[in-house]
């Protein structure tokens, strides 16, 4: 293999509520199809995040209790390394609750979890139905209009601040 993708999965034992590990399996398979090596390293509470040692950082979603534990560790122990990694060109893929933790805060009931503040957004769980289903957005990538398809399953509502959405 001529290339390799070095991936760090943050808290995979806790942030895997809807089998988010499937995203990593899909990424590994797509790399193999293209003859690109794939290295996966799990980073959890007692582990150090080394900014120059990864090409992609991935964080999935977890139960509220698990997200609270991870949020504290991210903010108190890993924020600076995460910011340094992204500033140095490392990609960051966050889904579900992992995405919510990138914002300024995530409110669940009477509790507000601290966010990393990497995205100008706040997420609040409001009364009403969960949003569950397939979704498609339009976005411009590389100067061309593209469609991105995905699946959403969330009860929180994210309010963007001084940032633009990926698509509409």
Predicted features and spans:
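Cysteine-nucleophile active-site neighborhood
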Residues: 64-141, 145
